[in-house]
């Protein structure tokens, strides 16, 4: 899978390969061949999203090659909030964390480009099998499958646009690609068209693909009830609309778009029936951030069955500091400055180890936790992401963690920001205060950001501080930081970041504008002159 042209065949092959590891295998003895094929295509998409060796580089030892969870870890590594607390020689995400080797010639570009276009082709394959000319003529199964496919495709294009749109920054200039997103591939796209497929305008991708797909998904899933948190639901569609309208609001400085974001965020909260994580659920040493069924907060997540777990190619091996099965421990922790910005009355602070280990009775799945936390883990190391089922010594069990893609808490943050951005600053302050006081403060403590929110800018800075804490490690906030032109800082006196990671970026980071891989520009030469500048090495590490 080196370019879009090759992805159609690859997607078909991947679907067949994945069908064997999908839970609840297709009942071929009672289904028609067409039904089996369609169901296999639909079920193959979420299985592909957690597949290792999805780009083919894992077979060469690239331990970053495990699909969407790896993408989330890559973007998180670019924020400045995540630091490596162990042996940096074993950090497989060092390119993203240190801004090296991110140009078109490097394999890491396949993680986003090849994967997303493979998944888009899989969604297209479902869409082209169902006659969408009249939704009312479809049966319930066809409606749900088509709704899933539209939701998936919208989500994939939304991510691609947010990754690859060139946004102005202080380090690179590319006026010729301003306003451009990515090539659009639809079921009707021919091979000849794919060979001459320029980057579409961002506005067109939103107006002609993302929003129409989400509208279709909303209509098709209006009366559908998802059986579990692993299945696309109407609430997820509303959540994707909230994300998309928030992006449009900022890009266009459009109060109406912000109002739409707030409205859809509230609809997602209502439709999901979800409630934010409790302190007990957040700190659960067995199920913390690894199980869709152990809480009421997840809107949508991905299951990684144990038979599909590879030792070094899963999210848990890189993000859980408690596991014992890896031959190395790069370890991930929080930026020291960000840690000390967390209110001591906020239970989220317990996600990372304080230098004074006796400051809190940290929970763990390990019987030797007290000694292990003191002697084996660095200060500020995270214990947010737990080995599945608490199996810290068995990668087949402990690595088989569910992966969260949307929590209801994100909708509370979108609603608060969008309300303020739309002109109701007092309303945004009230919403953030209510969320934090009701769901994050301990022992009856009250959170009040009023004194920090005299201006809209002040409020957004405070909201983003809380959002960065809330979603640390989950692959959410880089998109917000890019959207809002935020700075990041790992270099300062007392930093806990290794020397090569101490990047201080004023405003939007140049490496948040992802570069299209060379194999694509070779096979689709019209975009060879439309690529984003290579940001590698443009930000020198802070020397002190």
Where are the language model's segments positioned?
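Sec-dependent bacterial lipoprotein signal peptides
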Residues: 1-20
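Membrane-proximal, proline-rich intrinsically disordered regions
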Residues: 21-74, 319-333, 338-343, 351, ...
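Short, surface-exposed recognition loops and adjoining beta-strand edges that mediate ligand/DNA contacts
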Residues: 28-36, 65-69, 164-178, 223-317, ...
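Conserved, well-structured interaction surfaces
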Residues: 87-165, 200-205, 216-227, 398-403, ...
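Flexible, polar/acidic helix-loop-strand segments at domain edges
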Residues: 343-408
């Amino acid at each position: 899978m080196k370019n879009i042209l090759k992805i159609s065949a690859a997607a078909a092959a991947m679907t067949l390969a994945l069908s064997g590891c999908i839970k609840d295998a297709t009942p071929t003895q009672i289904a028609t061949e067409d039904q089996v094929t369609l169901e296999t295509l639909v079920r193959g998409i979420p299985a592909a999203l957690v597949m290792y060796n999805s780009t083919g580089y894992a077979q060469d030892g690239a331990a970053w090659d495990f699909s969407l969870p790896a993408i989330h870890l890559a973007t998180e590594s670019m924020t400045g909030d995540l630091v490596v607390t162990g042996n940096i020689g074993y950090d497989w995400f060092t390119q993203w964390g240190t801004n090296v080797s991110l140009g078109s010639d490097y394999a890491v570009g396949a993680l986003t480009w090849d994967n997303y276009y493979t998944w888009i082709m899989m969604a297209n394959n479902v869409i082209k099998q169902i006659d969408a000319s009249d939704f009312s003529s479809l049966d319930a199964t066809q409606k749900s499958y088509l709704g899933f496919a539209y939701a998936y495709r919208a989500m994939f294009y939304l991510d691609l646009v947010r990754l690859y749109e060139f946004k102005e920054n202080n380090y690179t200039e590319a006026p010729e690609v301003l306003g451009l997103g990515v090539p659009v591939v639809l079921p009707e796209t021919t091979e000849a068209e794919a060979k001459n497929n320029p980057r579409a305008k961002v506005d067109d991708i939103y107006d002609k693909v993302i929003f129409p797909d989400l509208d279709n998904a909303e209509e098709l899933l209006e009366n559908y009830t998802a059986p579990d948190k692993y299945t696309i639901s109407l609430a997820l569609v509303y959540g994707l609309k909230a994300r998309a309208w928030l992006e449009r609001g900022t890009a266009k400085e459009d109060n109406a778009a912000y109002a739409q974001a707030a409205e859809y965020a509230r609809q997602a909260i209502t439709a999901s029936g979800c409630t934010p994580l409790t302190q007990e659920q957040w700190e659960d040493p067995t199920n913390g951030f690894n199980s869709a069924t152990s809480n009421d907060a997840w809107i949508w997540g991905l299951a990684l069955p144990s038979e599909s777990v590879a030792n070094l190619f899963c999210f848990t091996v890189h993000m859980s500091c408690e596991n014992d099965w890896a031959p190395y421990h790069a370890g991930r922790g929080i930026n020291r400055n960000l840690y000390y910005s967390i209110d001591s009355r906020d239970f989220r602070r317990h996600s990372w180890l304080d230098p004074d280990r006796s400051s809190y009775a940290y929970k763990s799945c390990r019987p030797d936790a007290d000694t292990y936390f003191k002697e084996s883990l660095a200060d500020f190391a995270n214990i947010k992401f737990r080995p599945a089922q608490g199996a810290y010594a068995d990668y087949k069990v402990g690595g088989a963690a569910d992966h969260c893609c949307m929590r209801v808490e994100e909708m509370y943050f979108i609603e608060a920001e969008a309300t303020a951005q739309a002109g109701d600053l007092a309303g945004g302050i009230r919403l953030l205060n209510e969320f934090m006081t009701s769901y994050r403060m301990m022992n009856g403590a009250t959170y009040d950001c009023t004194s920090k929110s005299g201006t809209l800018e002040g409020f957004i800075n405070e909201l983003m501080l809380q959002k960065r804490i809330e979603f640390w490690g989950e692959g959410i906030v880089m998109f917000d930081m890019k959207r809002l032109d935020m700075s990041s800082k790992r270099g300062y006196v007392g930093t806990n970041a290794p020397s090569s990671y101490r990047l201080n970026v004023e405003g939007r980071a140049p490496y948040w504008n992802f570069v299209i891989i060379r194999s694509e520009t070779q096979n689709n030469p019209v975009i060879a002159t439309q690529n984003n500048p290579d940001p590698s090495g443009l930000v020198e590490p802070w020397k002190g």
